[in-house]
Amino acid sequence: MALKITLKPKERMILGGTVVVNGSSTSSDLIIEYKVPILRQKDILSEKDANSHSKRIYFAIQLMYIDEENRNTHQNIYLKLAKELVQAAPSTMGLIDKISESILSDKYYPALKLAKKLIAYEEEALSCAQ
């Protein structure tokens, strides 16, 4: 089944490891007829913006999703980061377990959604600590 995506003007997305940009001043519809990793601009985290532990976890999962060739390397980075985070904040164990289950099932997009919850949790915890 094909997937229809509407890109807003100048919006970016990653499609199978390639950055696609809508260069038009109007929205554009894309029909994707092949199963490839897709990340919309709102879901893409740059390496420089991965400036917290949970964001680095998100970034590692993002790379697992779009860079199949180096997936093992990204998984090892994720495991190290997840272990460090759980040691520093044991309350994150539940989310980390769910993220890890998704990764083990090769469900990287759902893992990214869970990692967004982890980022929100970390940000809330840090704001309460201040």
Language-model-derived ranges and their functions:
Residues 1-130:
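Terminal leader/tail segments of proteins
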